[in-house]
C-alpha cells in the first residue's frame, strides 16, 4: 500500500522526532549490545529512509530494506542530497524473504513495520531471517502499535491528507476478534498534464500482545530484553499506544 502514498508518507509522519528515536536506539546498544563495535546496521521497512539517514549521519554503515520501489526512490534521492550515498545500500525486498551479503551488529524496524506482518507464520519467517543475519548477541529493535492505537486511534476512523499534487483519503476498519485493522486508501495524483489519476489500495496491520511477541521471538532464537512505552525505558503494557521492543539474538 505504501507505493501509492509514498509522496505523502513524510508529511503523515512529519512530527516524529527521529533524533530522539536514534538516541534511544544508541542507548539500547550501549546497555545491551554485543561486545564489539556496532558498525553495520540493518533498517527493515526503511520507507523513505528517514531513520536510515539519521543513523548514517551518526557514522553507521546502513542497509535499508523495503518492499516499495517508490519509497526507496525517495530514500535514494534524500541520501544523495545529504551526501550519504556511500554509506547506504538500498534493497527492494520483501521482509519475509530478504537476503543480505553478510551479518550485521544491529537490526532496527521503525514505525510499526512489524504490525504489517499479519500472520504468525510470516512473523516467524521475518524474525528467523533477522536472527540469521545478526551476529551473536546482536540486537533487534522494533516498535509495534498497541491496543490503544488500534482501538482508539485507528478504530473505524477516516482521514484526509493533502500535499501539492496529491490528495489521499484513508479509511480504517478494525476487527477486535481477529485484531486486524484494514486500511482502504484512495489517492488522487496530479499528472504533468494537470489531470488527476485515481489509485486505490488495501493494507492491513495486526495487533500483537507483548506475550505473543515474546513467544514468537523466543521461538526464533531471540531473548526479549524489554518492552517500553517511550524513549525513557518505561515498561509498556498491551494498552500502550506504541510499544518499543528490545530483543537479543542468541546463538
What are these regions (language model features)?
Residues 115-117:
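A short His-aromatic
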Residues 110-112:
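Residues lining the SAM
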Residues 121, 141-214:
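SAM-dependent methyltransferase
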Residues 40-42, 49-97:
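Class I SAM-dependent methyltransferase SAM/SAH-binding core
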Residues 124-136:
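A short glycine-rich, Lys/Arg-flanked "PGG" loop and its adjoining helix->strand segment in the class I
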Residues 1-36:
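Conserved class I S-adenosyl-L-methionine
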Residues 99-106:
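A short acidic, Gly/Pro-enriched loop at the edge of an enzyme's catalytic core
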Residues 204-251:
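C-terminal lobe and adjacent flexible extensions of AdoMet/dcAdoMet transferase-like proteins
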Amino acid at each position: 500500500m505504501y507505493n501509492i502514498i509514498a509522496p505523502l508518507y513524510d508529511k503523515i509522519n512529519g512530527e516524529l522526532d527521529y533524533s530522539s528515536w536514534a538516541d534511544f536506539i544508541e542507548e539500547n546498544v550501549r546497555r545491551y549490545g554485543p561486545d564489539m563495535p556496532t558498525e553495520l546496521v540493518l533498517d527493515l521497512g526503511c520507507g523513505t529512509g528517514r531513520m536510515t539517514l539519521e543513523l548514517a549521519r551518526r557514522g553507521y554503515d546502513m542497509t535499508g530494506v523495503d518492499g516499495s520501489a517508490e519509497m526507496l526512490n525517495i530514500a535514494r534521492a534524500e541520501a544523495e542530497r545529504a551526501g550519504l550515498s556511500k554509506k547506504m545500500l538500498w534493497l527492494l525486498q520483501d521482509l519475509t524473504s530478504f537476503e543480505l551479503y553478510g551479518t550485521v551488529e544491529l537490526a532496527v524496524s521503525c514505525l510499526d513495520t512489524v504490525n504489517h506482518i499479519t500472520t504468525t507464520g510470516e512473523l516467524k519467517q521475518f524474525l528467523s531471517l533477522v536472527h540469521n543475519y545478526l551476529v551473536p548477541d546482536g540486537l533487534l529493535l522494533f516498535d509495534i502499535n498497541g491496543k490503544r492505537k488500534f482501538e482508539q486511534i485507528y478504530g473505524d476512523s477516516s482521514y484526509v491528507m493533502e500535499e501539492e499534487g496529491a490528495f489521499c483519503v484513508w479509511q480504517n476498519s478494525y476487527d477486535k476478534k481477529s485484531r486486524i485493522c484494514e486500511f482502504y486508501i484512495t489517492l488522487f495524483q496530479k499528472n504533468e498534464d494537470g489531470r488527476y489519476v485515481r489509485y486505490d489500495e488495501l493494507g492491513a496491520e495486526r495487533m500483537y500482545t507483548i506475550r505473543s511477541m515474546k513467544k514468537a521471538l523466543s521461538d526464533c532464537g531471540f531473548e526479549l530484553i524489554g518492552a517500553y512505552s517511550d524513549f525513557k525505558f518505561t515498561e509498556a503494557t498491551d494498552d500502550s499506544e506504541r510499544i518499543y521492543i528490545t530483543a537479543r539474538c542468541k546463538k
